Amino acid sequence: MSRKLARELTMKVLFEMHINNDFNIQRVEHHLFEGSIEEQQKEYIHKVLNEAILNLEAIDSIIEEYSTSWKLNRIANVDLAILRLAFSEIIYMKDIPYRVSINEAIELAKIYGSDETPNFVNGILGKYVEQEGLMLNE
């Protein structure tokens, strides 16, 4: 399994957790690791999910702050899952370049979101990166 597919699976799990309002990683781990997932990708999935769950309030607060005029409960569930994934990577996984996280989030948005989702996701992530000065640290 490639990192791209691992990222997609992680987004789907975050989506499922949100829909079920159950952010207990033990409940999803059993079916997460069925099949042929390489150890490196298992580690990635586990780390992203842990960071997203442990920092859910902080991540959601950032999403609300940068999605001007949009309350969290008005953001489409899939868009929210994509943003939570991307912010988990950008903020807590410094080994992943923020540009990769943004590009991959946009690709997921093109596949799973509405026609507006890629621009919405790009706008929020781009504003965050700019405001936080991450572009200066390249």
From Swiss-Prot:
Against InterPro entries, the record matches this protein to: NusB-like_sf, NusB_fam, NusB_RsmB_TIM44
Q: Which domain of life is it from?
A: Bacteria
Q: Gene Ontology cellular component?
A: cytosol
Decide whether keyword RNA-binding is in the record: yes
Alphabetized GO MF terms? RNA binding
Question: A biological process (GO) annotation for this entry?
Answer: transcription antitermination
**What does the UniProt keyword field contain?**
RNA-binding, Transcription, Transcription antitermination, Transcription regulation
Asked if the keyword Transcription belongs to this entry, the reply reads yes
Role this protein plays:
Involved in transcription antitermination. Required for transcription of ribosomal RNA (rRNA) genes. Binds specifically to the boxA antiterminator sequence of the ribosomal RNA (rrn) operons.
PANTHER family to which the protein is assigned, alphabetical? ANTITERMINATION NUSB DOMAIN-CONTAINING PROTEIN, N UTILIZATION SUBSTANCE PROTEIN B-RELATED
Q: Which family does it belong to?
A: Belongs to the NusB family.
Q: What is this protein called?
A: Transcription antitermination protein NusB
Gene that produces this protein: nusB
